[in-house]
């Protein structure tokens, strides 16, 4: 039984749109509290056309409940699940930075190659977040069996301070939180999904490790070996493309890194990494075995220099003009006149 209950008016003022997808929109917002308290957050809102679909709403709520208990430096934190006039929204940690898609595009625009050690470091931070999520249990100590199922460039963020964050557990599966049509529909981005996903099979945590391997190969090579003209063609490449000797594609990839990539991208589950902890160990040993290696500060300096003076608008800016006036309250949605 609770000691007592606090009833508080929680108000969010939308500042600008950050990102837009097929099912939802993410905004930068100001959370207002008592005595002039203001905190910048990200607000994820369901599109109107999905707001009345019970299964979609159930998954959206399930995502919020699931991620609320995932408190880790490499996972975007969820603060609040709200509903206003039938529109559900999630208030999340605001990351001032870019996703990996924007990060790699900036390298192309500036004719730069991402240093090998930083590529490995980024994926090692993703592996840290996955290791935590995969091991998460409920209050009774029972494993939740979390599988992200969409480890991809758009769902990995790098803050300008150098923190790497995994986000969007919207199609994750976990016992008791989200409805699951696994085996009936394909979830995830075709060129980042595992062979199990691509062939409509059940997945476990090893599926996320294959996707992490795709991310690492993409960061190193500058392109995704599975990406084709259409999602279906990409899916077929995930299932059939021979995994290359990466040493022949990039002279910076040595024997040890090639072995890590092949183990992560093994189609045979028994030959793939068994856990994110195993992948993390190999990645960290690779970059730190000689002593000093990359840190968040190293990555932060690199990304700030990469985007400095480029005119890029990849990340939320605190100087952006307030462009909408949309106000979200706990049980109220209005647009001021």
Give the location of each predicted region:
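Conserved ATP-binding/catalytic core of the eukaryotic-like protein kinase fold
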Residues: 1-244
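C-terminal lobe helix-coil module of Hanks-type protein kinase domains
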Residues: 157, 191-334
């Amino acid at each position: 039984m609770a000691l007592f209950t606090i009833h508080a008016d929680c108000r969010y003022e939308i500042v600008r749109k950050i990102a837009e997808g097929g099912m939802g929109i993410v905004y930068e917002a100001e959370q207002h509290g008592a005595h002039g308290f203001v905190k910048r957050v990200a607000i994820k809102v369901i599109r109107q056309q999905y707001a009345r679909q019970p299964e979609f709403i159930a998954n959206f709520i399930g995502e919020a409940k699931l991620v609320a208990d995932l408190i880790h430096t490499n996972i975007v934190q969820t603060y609040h699940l709200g509903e206003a006039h039938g529109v559900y929204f999630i208030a999340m940690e605001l990351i001032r930075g870019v996703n990996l898609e924007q990060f790699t595009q900036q390298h192309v625009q500036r004719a730069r190659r991402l240093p090998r050690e930083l590529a490995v470091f980024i994926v090692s931070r993703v592996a840290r977040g996955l290791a935590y999520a995969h091991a998460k249990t409920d209050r009774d100590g029972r494993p939740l069996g979390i599988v992200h199922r969409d480890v991809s460039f758009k769902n990995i963020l790098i803050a300008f301070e150098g923190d790497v964050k995994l986000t969007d557990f919207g199609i994750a599966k976990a016992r008791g939180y989200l409805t699951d049509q696994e085996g009936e529909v394909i979830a995830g981005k075709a060129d980042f999904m595992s062979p199990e996903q691509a062939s409509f099979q059940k997945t476990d945590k090893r599926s996320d490790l294959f996707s992490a391997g795709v991310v690492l190969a993409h960061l190193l090579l500058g392109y995704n070996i599975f990406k084709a003209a259409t999602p279906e063609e990409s899916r077929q490449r995930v299932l059939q493309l021979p995994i290359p000797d990466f040493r022949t594609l990039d002279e910076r990839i040595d024997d040890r890194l090639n072995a890590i990539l092949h183990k992560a991208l093994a189609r045979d589950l028994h030959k793939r990494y068994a856990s994110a902890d195993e992948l993390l160990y190999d990645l960290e040993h690779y970059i730190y075995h000689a002593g000093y290696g990359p840190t968040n500060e190293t990555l932060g300096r690199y990304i700030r220099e990469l985007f400095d003076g480029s005119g890029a608008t990849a990340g939320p800016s605190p100087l952006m003009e307030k462009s909408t006036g949309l106000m979200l309250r706990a049980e109220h949605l209005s647009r001021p006149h």
